[in-house]
Amino acid sequence: MKAKTTVFGRILKCYDLPLEEVNDLNIQYEKEKSKLNSFGHRLAGRLDSELEFTHLLGQTKLAKTIGECLNDYIDTIEKLGIFNEEKKLHILSCWVNDMKEGEYNPPHTHHDLTGWSTVLFLKVPEYIDDTKDPHKFKDGMLGFISHDSIGTTWAEPKVGEFYIFEAKHQHMVMPFKTKPKGKIRRTMSFNFVQKILENERRSRYDTWLP
């Protein structure tokens, strides 16, 4: 499994997940989409389709691979001396975003700044690149704001790329224009923690985690 680590005051890892497993998740989502509840009331995004997927994640072919990635991330921060607790992880919430042209996610954090968060790109449409100068900003980028808030690290979306980062790491998703019109960009995200707090109900769906 190919992985890269970026360190700039926050620990960010990106994994390339198997496309056949990504396709399976897309198929499962399309089958269940009409029955899923909106999760938008708990999210920062300015988009229409934000649906909860927590109870279905463990049934996908990606579940085992995702569990391996979570453990690898924790192993990384353990080696860096950042984490020294029992490794027993719990997914608190999972949702899928279908983002249309002009929609976006403003700079935000997750889950009261505790634990870790993820972004997995499931579908990426062809963007219109109408910039005339090479130094101009590209639309549709995923941005991670630096620890000192001076700069931002930008990532160009690619299907199968899975990012894991601290919940307190400010990030954002820029709007885009597509060709042909009407295509969506699909991502899945979830929050996970090492310890369940008293005011948090443990999900009965995360027992598949190793």
What are the functions of these language-model segments?
Residues 93-164, 172-174, 182-184, 191, ...:
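Catalytic core of non-heme Fe(II) oxygenases with the double-stranded beta-helix
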Residues 81-83, 87-94, 118:
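Hydrophobic, well-structured mid-protein blocks that either form specific transmembrane helices
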Residues 169:
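A generic "binding-loop/recognition-motif" signal
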Residues 11-13, 184-188:
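Short beta-strand micro-motifs in enzyme catalytic cores
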Residues 1-86, 102-105:
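Non-heme Fe(II)/2-oxoglutarate
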